[in-house]
C-alpha cells in the first residue's frame, strides 16, 4: 500500500547550499521532517548545477514523516540574467531596456528548461523564454 501524503512543500534553495537555517529549516521542521537528511540528499542531487543557483524543489511529506523530493530546473529569469551577465531586470520593462538577448541564447536557455516547460517543440519553448525576457526589460533580437 502506498504511503499517505501529508503535505507538499515548495521551496527555492541554492544548489549545493541547503542547510538547516531559514527557509529550509522552519519549512521542514513544522512538518517533522529530518532536516539534515534532506539537506544532504538535496546537496548531493544538485552537484551538477552551478553552486548558488536557485533551484525549485517540491518536497512530498508522508504521514510517517518520511519524504521524497523532486528538483526542477532553475527559473528562466535567473538563467536569462546569467547568460547575458546582468544583475537584475528592469523596474519598468516596457520603458527601460537593460540588455539584449539573441535567438541563440534564447535557444540555449530553452534547451535547459525544456523538461519543465509546457511546450511541444523548441520554437514554442523559445517563445516562452522570449516572453520572460521581454517582461524583464530585455530586448529580444531575431
Curated annotation (Swiss-Prot):
GO terms for molecular function: large ribosomal subunit rRNA binding; structural constituent of ribosome. One or more lysine residues are methylated. This is Large ribosomal subunit protein uL11. It comes from the Bacteria. InterPro entries: Ribosomal_uL11, Ribosomal_uL11_bac-typ, Ribosomal_uL11_C, Ribosomal_uL11_C_sf, Ribosomal_uL11_N, Ribosomal_uL11_N_sf. One of its GO terms (biological process) is translation. One of its GO terms (cellular component) is cytosolic large ribosomal subunit. SUPFAM superfamilies: Ribosomal L11/L12e N-terminal domain, Ribosomal protein L11, C-terminal domain. Keywords: Methylation, Ribonucleoprotein, Ribosomal protein, RNA-binding, rRNA-binding. Signal peptide: none annotated. Belongs to the universal ribosomal protein uL11 family. The keyword Ribosomal protein applies. SMART domains: RL11. NCBIfam families: L11_bact.
Amino acid at each position: 500500500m502506498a504511503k499517505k501524503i501529508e503535505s507538499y512543500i515548495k521551496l527555492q534553495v541554492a544548489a549545493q547550499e541547503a542547510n538547516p537555517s531559514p527557509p529550509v529549516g522552519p519549512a521542514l521542521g513544522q512538518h517533522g521532517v529530518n532536516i539534515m537528511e534532506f539537506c544532504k540528499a538535496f546537496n548531493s542531487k544538485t552537484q551538477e548545477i552551478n553552486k548558488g543557483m536557485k533551484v525549485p524543489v517540491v518536497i512530498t511529506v508522508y504521514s510517517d514523516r518520511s519524504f521524497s523530493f523532486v528538483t526542477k530546473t532553475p527559473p528562466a529569469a535567473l538563467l536569462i540574467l546569467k547568460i547575458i551577465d546582468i544583475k537584475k531586470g528592469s523596474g519598468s520593462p516596457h520603458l527601460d531596456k537593460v540588455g539584449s538577448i539573441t535567438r541563440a541564447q534564447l535557444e540555449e536557455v530553452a534547451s535547459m528548461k525544456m523538461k519543465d516547460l509546457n511546450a511541444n517543440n523548441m520554437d514554442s519553448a523559445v517563445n516562452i523564454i522570449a516572453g520572460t525576457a521581454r517582461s524583464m526589460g530585455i530586448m529580444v533580437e531575431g
